[in-house]
UniProtKB/Swiss-Prot annotation:
This is Dihydroorotase. Pathway: Pyrimidine metabolism; UMP biosynthesis via de novo pathway; (S)-dihydroorotate from bicarbonate: step 3/3. It comes from Marinobacter nauticus (strain ATCC 700491 / DSM 11845 / VT8) (Marinobacter aquaeolei). The lineage of its organism: Bacteria, Pseudomonadati, Pseudomonadota, Gammaproteobacteria, Pseudomonadales. Zn(2+) 2 binds at K98, H135, H173. GO terms for biological process: 'de novo' pyrimidine nucleobase biosynthetic process; 'de novo' UMP biosynthetic process. Substrate binds at H16, V17, R18, N42, H135, L219, H251, A263.
Length: 343
């Protein structure tokens, strides 16, 4: 049995770090392992222009406590976003813009109601080389929550890719067999997808059978076992269009364990060990480096990291609770054994 592996330093291509005191509590866990992370812009108020993005970046760097961690900044697309906003953000170093369908997830009320309303913005993004990151769910009240992603593929994503064939798009945190198949069947190299640890480790039975487990509640919601298996097959395939994105989303314990609990799993703490466990279980540890360290950088057109991290197979127990401003936070797989960790 493999006891130690050394890989190129990984990156996290989908991360929430919030703001204020919470930011200071959660950034170090990511900075200890990952070289870079795509920072989600759904603050209150959202990050909608270059100046807000750069100010947010400065706050994250201050919380990284002297590491070489690089936050990669994004804009929150609204129906007031302009092509000039995109060009200014690109010039300032913003690498991507995020499409949140209005009402789809945490702090998405300012999102887009109809993607056609921002077609001029998408054209500007394609022209200047800014990536589009997509929360791939429709929000129509008559669409079942377990079907939102599938409908999005047909109704929104496919027409957008046709309209903008040079726009590079990341379908984030995919949860369905249909999404995995859509990415693998797409003709061209302009569509990629991130996969979270929770969607690879769990399905909706884990969340609902024997009692509701609120710390597994996230959006897009966990799906049937057949979808979990399809996601695992996708990463096992070695297809370079799939890459690591934790979607780590910190919420205080009392905000999760509530009558109307928040969506999101906090997975930044020990994240690379969670992925290593999954890849070991699938018998594909040799593919972890590409998934975690190469595929995302290559898709974004960024250089791969040049330093390395070493993982050792020394089982440890994920803490039941971690300190967080405003109350503790329960990490993904709390109280359970994780086999791999950073050396």
């Amino acid at each position: 049995m493999t006891r130690q592996i050394t890989i190129t330093r990984p990156d996290d291509w989908h991360l929430h770090v919030r703001d204020g005191d919470i930011l200071n509590d959660v950034v170090p866990a990511t900075a200890a392992c990952f070289g870079r992370a795509i920072i989600m812009p759904n603050l209150v108020p959202p990050v909608t222009d270059a100046s807000a993005a750069m100010a947010y970046r400065d706050r994250i760097l201050a919380a990284a406590r002297g590491t070489d961690f690089q936050p990669l900044m994004t804009l929150y697309l609204t129906e007031s976003t302009t092509a000039e906003t995109i060009r200014e953000a690109k010039a300032a170093g913003v690498v991507a813009a995020k499409l949140y369908p209005a009402g789809a997830t945490t702090n998405s009320a300012s999102g887009v109601t109809d993607i056609r309303n921002i077609y001029p913005v998408l054209e500007a993004m394609a022209d200047c080389g800014m990536l589009l990151l997509v929360h791939g769910e429709v929000t129509d009240s008559d669409i079942d929550i377990f079907d939102r992603e599938k409908v999005f593929l047909e109704r929104v994503l496919a027409p957008t890719l046709t309209a903008f064939p040079s726009l590079r798009v990341v379908l984030e945190h995919i949860t369905t067999a249909e999404s995995a198949e859509f990415v693998r069947n797409h003709q061209g190299n302009n569509l990629g997808a991130t996969l979270t640890p929770q969607h690879l480790m769990y399905n909706r039975n884990h969340m609902l059978v024997g009692g509701i487990r609120p710390h597994l509640y996230c959006l897009p919601i966990l799906k049937r076992n057949k979808h979990q298996e399809a996601l695992r097959e996708a990463v096992a395939s070695g297809d370079p269009r799939f890459f690591l994105g934790t979607d780590s989303a910190p919420h205080a314990k009392d905000k999760k364990e509530a009558a109307c609990g928040c969506a999101g799993c906090y997975s930044a703490y020990g994240a690379i060990g969670l992925y290593a466990d999954i890849f070991e279980e699938l018998g594909i540890l040799d593919k972890l480096e590409a998934f975690a360290s190469f595929n995302g950088a290559d898709f974004y057109g960024l250089p791969r990291n040049t330093d390395t991290v070493t993982l050792v197979r020394e089982p440890w127990t994920m803490p039941e609770n971690l300190p967080l401003a405003g109350g503790g936070i329960v990490p993904l797989k709390a109280g359970e054994t994780v086999n791999w960790r950073l050396a």
